[in-house]
Amino acid sequence: MPQLDSGGGGAGGGDDLGAPDELLAFQDEGEEQDDKSRDSAAGPERDLAELKSSLVNESEGAAGGAGIPGVPGAGAGARGEAEALGREHAAQRLFPDKLPEPLEDGLKAPECTSGMYKETVYSAFNLLMHYPPPSGAGQHPQPQPPLHKANQPPHGVPQLSLYEHFNSPHPTPAPADISQKQVHRPLQTPDLSGFYSLTSGSMGQLPHTVSWFTHPSLMLGSGVPGHPAAIPHPAIVPPSGKQELQPFDRNLKTQAESKAEKEAKKPTIKKPLNAFMLYMKEMRAKVIAECTLKESAAINQILGRRWHALSREEQAKYYELARKERQLHMQLYPGWSARDNYGKKKRRSREKHQESTTGGKRNAFGTYPEKAAAPAPFLPMTVL
């Protein structure tokens, strides 16, 4: 360390030696770094603004020269247009993170330019562009381009297609600096799922203008009126499925009812009468006239006692009549069996018993009453 003299001149010399060291250490260090950082940050933006202004001026000059025949500046305008395109491609390679200026051309993708949701998709993406980014550490700032161009070409002059990645049918993949962790994957909504699939397999195929501005709070709502915002669970039976099942049940019921009607229309074939039945048929009117009893059971008991009181010769006459009755019945109904009538009676009695005990309606395939269909349980949706 240099020795300072105690005199006035030595003190002045010592002050001169120590002043530059103090200024370098405490005053100029932070200011120089701030100036360098500001210059480095403002350099790319200033270059991009100069490129855009030169492109607009050259395109206007080329369009004005091409509209007037015989002007020698038309060829120079075409060459200027080619040079402008080359500089634009170079600027896109130098600054891949910058968002292009024309919002109207970029938002209307080839799939959205024709269809029934053209205007609604444009408005939905307009909202997405101006929604503030989610607060979180480590995320890049999301640029918000202006909605209107500063310099519009005059009416009637064709606009130059300066940005090819919006007009190409195959969209460019997302930039490499945006990882999959930073991209939110909300649920698909009906108004956007038809145009951009937001599944994990197709996230890499989205244009970066769409993948940057997919915010969960906006995507959960519906941009198109009349469409539900939530997707129903597959376990819930839709009303259309119930409507499809109802005609099927009606067809089954009509088939069962038609079968029952056919069986009811068939005439019931009675079995041939035996000897005692023939005697009852002949003597019943006489017993009713003689007795004051009107009950059928009492009349049958009286006829039974009289039948057993008859002799063998008298009973043989009725047995012969019964044999002739059976022969005639066999000729009229050759394939008839007494089991057919007994089966019908059993079925009818079983149906009546079921209806009286349960009071419900029988199913076409069983003897149990139909129950009301239990509604499907509602499963809550989980937001990923």
Swiss-Prot record:
Tissues and organs where the protein is expressed, per its UniProt entry: Predominantly expressed in T-cells. Also detected in proliferating intestinal epithelial cells and in the basal epithelial cells of mammary gland epithelium.
Basic and acidic residues bias: start-end ranges: 35-50, 352-370
Statement: the UniProt record of this protein carries the keyword Transcription regulation: yes
Highest rank taxon of the organism: Eukaryota
Biased composition (Gly residues): 1-16, 62-78
Biological process annotations from GO: canonical Wnt signaling pathway; cellular response to interleukin-4; gamma-delta T cell differentiation; immune response; regulation of DNA-templated transcription; regulation of gamma-delta T cell differentiation; regulation of transcription by RNA polymerase II
Annotated region (Disordered), positions in chain: 1-88, 133-183, 337-384
Lyase among keywords: no
Positions with biased composition (Low complexity): 374-384
Pfam families: CTNNB1_binding, HMG_box
Protein name, UniProt field: Transcription factor 7
Lineage, opening ranks: Eukaryota, Metazoa, Chordata, Craniata, Vertebrata
